[in-house]
Curated annotation (Swiss-Prot):
The lineage of its organism: Eukaryota, Metazoa, Chordata, Craniata, Vertebrata. It comes from Mus musculus (Mouse). One of its GO terms (cellular component) is nucleus. Belongs to the Dus family. Dus1 subfamily. Keywords: Cytoplasm, Flavoprotein, FMN, NAD, NADP, Nucleus, Oxidoreductase, tRNA processing. Residues 373-383 have a biased composition (Basic residues). This is tRNA-dihydrouridine(16/17) synthase [NAD(P)(+)]-like. Residues 343-388 are annotated as: Disordered. GO terms for molecular function: flavin adenine dinucleotide binding; tRNA-dihydrouridine16 synthase activity; tRNA-dihydrouridine17 synthase activity. Its EC number is 1.3.1.88.
Length: 475
């Protein structure tokens, strides 16, 4: 069957999806996607996957895609970050049988994307992007799509979108914030930019940014004319957003934990989800926040969830009629609701007390005083300095651009070093890889075994023969 394109792809393959769960590193994992789909999401994206790692590392492919196959988890778009046409296409070819389209991340504004040269840091490299999209469009059996951030100028954003469309992009998600609008500087997304793109291209467009409830979805579609709306933070705080419901926070937590039992994921993902889902409740019941941070098992998390449910139910039963929710919240803390991130200097209860780790980290650079955690660290080590300019700079792996191991003899990251050391039967003590030493030991041992010596002469040991000896070291 010929590959469907543009609007036909959106309406037939994606079922005309309007309610879309965003790609979210460590957060749009299978269990969360299934929860969101049960509550109105019609299309989900995987978290961003690193194309180069996906190509070279079979375990990464298994852990991040192949083991997460589930018939209810469709339609699904797999997102990659990449900056090389061949690598992008190789990764996409390995993923295309497990999804309905491949998305290129052109929106990540984080430092890690700057260092790895991907995401929004490719925004100015139109020639490279054209080549990446064109090659993917030609070689893949599924459509290629892009998720972009806007430029400050509407006309440049429009030309950018048109360039991607011309190269073969079949669906565009426009996050209406610029690369600089992140963390405490995120502000609001510009639907004006999104509307202008929608008018100027002939492919379906999803809007992203400022979506906190179902009314926002309807308003955004009306104002901008887009085909669908994507939500990240709104979905994390209320996965029933697309149903237009705001359930009790423990209800969705319990349902999510049940799904995680069937489709396990790292505990760090689960914890991060619950911190968001319970954001407002944990402001009130700080003890539970600490317990959640400390638990080490899924059953431990379930126990915290049970305790939180009881506390919330007590709070509900004590609630007097006519009393409004505290802190100008739209609903009481036990109801799933949006979290509006405070601006850079905005005064709020959060700014005076138990703020999130992330909020503290984001302001790190601009704070004159030190956070509680940093003060504690300084007490333990009086010579510790928190001046960002004195932080050691990450040196890059010569091969893939990830941070290299400090003591690596090859100047590579662990993954690349392991491959090279294996190929060359070498040691890298910095990474604890001892292929050469193990081979020598194994040969010495074989030398002491009379029966084996004979076999040795018939079959000389080469690096590939070596794999039989230490194959398990690579598992
Ligand atoms: C926890 C988290 C992880 C994210 N990871 C990704 C990602 O992997 N790929 C991507 O394109 N955007 C990622 N984003 C950005 C979102 O997809 C989205 O563009 C952004 O949050 C704006 O949407 P919102 O206003 O609905 O939050 C992430 C956002 C969050 C909150």
């Amino acid at each position: 069957m010929p590959k469907l394109q543009g609007f036909e792809f959106w309406s037939r393959t994606l079922g005309g999806a309007r309610h879309v769960v965003a790609p979210m590193v460590d957060q749009s994992e299978l269990a969360w996607r299934l929860l969101s789909r049960r509550h109105g999401a019609q299309l989900c994206y995987t978290p961003m996957l690193h194309a180069q790692v996906f190509v070279r590392d079979a375990n990464y492919r298994k852990e991040n895609l192949y083991c997460d196959v589930c018939p209810e988890d469709r339609p699904l778009i797999v997102q990659f970050c990449a900056n090389d046409p061949e690598v992008f296409v190789q990764a996409a070819l390995l993923a295309q049988d497990y999804c309905d389209a491949i998305d290129l991340n052109l929106g990540c504004p984080q430092m890690i994307a700057k260092r790895g040269h991907y995401g929004a840091f490719l925004q100015e490299e139109w020639d490279l992007l054209q080549r990446m999209i064109l090659l993917a469009h030609e070689r893949l059996s599924v459509p290629v799509t892009c998720k972009i951030r806007v430029f400050p100028e509407i006309d440049k954003t429009v030309r950018y979108a048109q360039m991607l469309e011309k190269a073969g992009c079949q669906l565009l998600t426009v996050h209406g914030r610029t690369k600089e609008q992140k963390g405490p500087m995120a502000g609001t997304a510009s639907w004006e930019h999104i509307k202008a793109v929608r008018k100027a291209v002939g492919i379906p467009v999803f809007a992203n940014g400022n979506i906190q409830c179902l009314q926002d979805v309807e308003r955004c579609i009306q104002d901008t004319g887009v085909q669908g709306v994507m939500s990240a933070e709104g979905n994390l705080h209320n996965p029933a957003l697309f149903e237009g419901r705001s359930p009790a926070v423990w209800e969705l937590a319990e349902e999510y934990l049940d799904i995680v039992r069937q489709h396990p994921c790292p505990l760090s993902y689960v914890r991060a989800h619950l911190f968001k889902l319970w954001h407002h409740t944990l402001q009130v019941h700080q003890q539970l926040r600490e317990e959640l941070a400390k638990v080490k098992t899924l059953e431990g998390v379930a126990a915290v969830s049970q305790a939180l449910k009881l506390r919330c139910q007590e709070d509900m039963s004590r609630q007097q009629e006519g009393v409004r929710p505290a802190d100008n919240l739209p609903a009481f803390h036990w109801i799933c609701q949006p979290y509006i991130r405070p601006g850079p200097r905005e005064g709020s209860k959060e700014n005076s007390g138990g703020r999130s780790k992330r909020a503290l980290e984001e302001e790190e650079g601009s704070m004159e005083g030190l956070s509680k955690n940093k003060l504690k660290k300084q007490l333990r080590n009086p010579h510790k300095t928190f001046d960002p300019s004195l932080k050691p700079k990450y040196a890059k792996c010569d091969q893939c651009g990830n941070p290299k191991g400090n003591r690596c003899v090859f100047n590579l990251c662990r993954g690349c070093c392991k491959k090279r050391a294996f190929r060359e039967t070498a040691d890298c003590p910095g990474h604890g890889l001892l292929f050469k030493t193990k081979l020598e030991k194994s040969l010495a041992w074989k030398g002491t075994q009379p029966g084996l010596q004979e076999a040795q002469q018939v079959r000389p040991v080469t690096p590939s023969g070596f794999s039989e000896v230490v194959g398990s070291a690579l598992a």
